[in-house]
Amino acid sequence: MKRIEVSERTDRQLMTSSLHDLAIAMEQDLWEIKLAHRPKSFWYPYSTLHNIAVLEKLSATAGLHLLDLCRGVHGKVADIGAADGDLAFFLEKHGLSVDVIDNEYTNFNGLAGARTVKEALNSSVVIRSVDLDSQFALPHQKYDALFFLGTLYHLKNPFFLLESLARITKYCFVSTRIAKQTADGQSLSPYPVAYLLGPQECNNDDTNFWIFSDHGLKRLIERTGWNLLSYVTIGDTAGSTPADPKRDERAFCLLEKRPPSLSARPNPVPAGDGPGKTTVSWDTADGSIGKIFVSINGDQEVLFADGRRGTAPAHWIEAGSNYEFRFYNSDHTELLAKVAVTRATQ
């Protein structure tokens, strides 16, 4: 297959151009590559790199820089629901290691487009076909950031997906269609709800399922283990409906994984006669199972409690001893949090 290089730009251009400007320039380069291999009808028809401007705005609103938040300890980001991979190839050009994750059976061209561009660019982007409506396993265990744009409403179980993503990344960009009212004018905005589309109701596409209200999307985000750092809507922000292409509203969000929590109250345990008592509370935040172990005076730790979230009493706290409660993931390979408990002597 013929390889075509994306045009190189000088360091001065990189410093003086916004990421959005660079993205639009690269989109033009990518179209040259695409049309050199297949006719226009073969390729995903919508622009994905125009979203860079919104992603930059979300990042700045949260006091972050788009590329900086992608450069973390895991050395990897992923573009989920990637169409032809334009965003992934753009991020790779800016020094990131990227996975493309999409379902070849629902992707616009069966991921053949992304694979064609990958070969033409001699890219190192990893392309994986994953059915996100299954009990999936992603190809790289942990990511610094995920890009999950325009895909949520194509999934049968958005709750499961967002909860699963919270277990493998710190940051996640999400965009999806939302609606302020039904087609006949009934208001959805005040309620945390989602509208289930008919199979041909929206864009004649039976892979469209759930259109959330603004309040419903924010409730979903909170319930699946995320903090909402920034949020913006574009399109018909006054009278959007679930299916009308002329009344289309999109929400863009920057999410941060909510950290696991572990606490003991009271701590220190008040002095008194007999053993003292504290109540240990925990929450994994992402729906996974956690395990609480306790070590007394530095001795071998023993299992104290387990579960997604809960409380348990420790009614054997003695003065002069130190109790360290340690919160692990389900297979005891990652320490999520810890708290030291003591008892007052008087």
Per-region residue spans from a language model:
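Conserved N-terminal segment of class I S-adenosyl-L-methionine
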Residues: 2-142, 190, 242-254
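A short, structure-level motif marking secondary-structure boundaries and short turns
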Residues: 71-73, 100, 147, 201-204, ...
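Hydrophobic beta-strand segments of well-ordered beta-sheets in folded domains
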Residues: 98, 170-173, 290
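Conserved beta-strand termini and adjacent loop/short-helix elements that scaffold enzyme active sites
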Residues: 130, 231-234, 265
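S-adenosyl-L-methionine-dependent methyltransferase catalytic module, highlighting the catalytic core
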Residues: 135-137, 147-148, 156-258
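Conserved SAM-binding site of S-adenosyl-L-methionine-dependent methyltransferases, i.e.
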Residues: 152
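Extended, solvent-exposed regions of the mature portions of secreted/cell-surface glycoproteins
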Residues: 259-346
